[in-house]
Amino acid sequence: MQFFCVNLYRSVLNLLEERMKTEMIEEMVIVGGLVMVQFVYAGNSLLMSYLMSLGLGPFTIVIFSTFATFIILSPFAILFERKQWPNELSLRLIGKLVLISFAGVTLFQSLFLEGIRLTSPAMATAMPNLAPGLIFFIAWIVGLEKMNLKCVYSKLKILGTLLCVFGALAMSVMHSTSISHKEEDDTPIFVFDRDKVVGCIYLLGAVFVLSTNVVLQASTLAEFPAPISLSAITALLGVLITTVVLLLQNRKTKVLASSLISFGNLVGYSVLAGAVSGACVSFNGWAMKKRGPVFVSMFSPFATVISVAFAVLTLGESVSLGSVGGMVLMFVGLYLVLWAKGKEGFSEIESFESEFDSKKPLLS
């Protein structure tokens, strides 16, 4: 009996070691992919800024690029994920899909673009860095993020999230402040601007909508475990809802608001942006399915780091000491969260080994 228990113990340990190796490789793929996604997002923002500088309206870009995302992702969804589709679409699942589309495409874009118009691009870049903290809080409330305040790893996750948020905000705000001081030395420091206050409220609303939408996506993936299909469906619904909203607002939707860009170039840019966005959203959905919404959101401040680095390398802008300090805080916070979540994942293995310690007799 003792010989059988020893062999069983060793075989289970071997299986656990193989599982740990597989999870380590998967972890490297997820982390590397999420960093690359932020590089792509930063480049996509530059492309969108360039298109708007040519006179294209932001909603025109959103509608074209989102529809291109649907066209590009649909064949892959049918080819690779058809077996994962549910047999029946419940009213609850349909409601979630419509809500994700409305919140992620129409409502978020409306609030975010209005916030940019009333404030500044620098403030709009800083505000989304609040998303990891909000996503952590919302996921905790709805039960998608495991938390035990008596556990040291849970406390480290909270500390790491706060450090990441504060560091990203400090980096972006300090960087934009150093630029504004160079350009506007004679401007008073304390000036109450009603439009900027309202714009900040719009941006906060956009960040809250984005955070809620990310958690809702994670919840929907449990019922609809097909991230590519989910991205394609929500892209199509988002285009339809955005178009209807624009028509209800009696806005004239001009396809070409500027003669600087041809229709063919617009289609080409839209296909490029749609392909990039579709790939990134699908990978984020897969990573969210594997590691949860909080883990994925912790990488979003990387876009700010990339934007600052690009401004320094190409535009010759200087980086203040506060920006460097914020960057250090952000990376420390990110490392704490990754380390704590990894330790939480292997806590079950450690508890198993403690129950079957090889130094203790198996039979008593």
Swiss-Prot record:
Keywords: Membrane, Repeat, Transmembrane, Transmembrane helix. This is WAT1-related protein At5g47470. GO terms for molecular function: transmembrane transporter activity. It is found in: Membrane. The lineage of its organism: Eukaryota, Viridiplantae, Streptophyta, Embryophyta, Tracheophyta. Belongs to the drug/metabolite transporter (DMT) superfamily. Plant drug/metabolite exporter (P-DME) (TC 2.A.7.4) family. It is a multi-pass membrane protein. SUPFAM superfamilies: Multidrug resistance efflux transporter EmrE. Pfam families: EamA. GO terms for cellular component: membrane. It comes from Arabidopsis thaliana (Mouse-ear cress). The keyword Membrane applies. The chain crosses the membrane at residues 28-48, 59-79, 93-113, 124-144, 158-178, 197-217, 228-248, 255-275, 293-313, 319-339. The keyword Signal does not apply. Residues 40-172, 219-338 form the EamA domain.
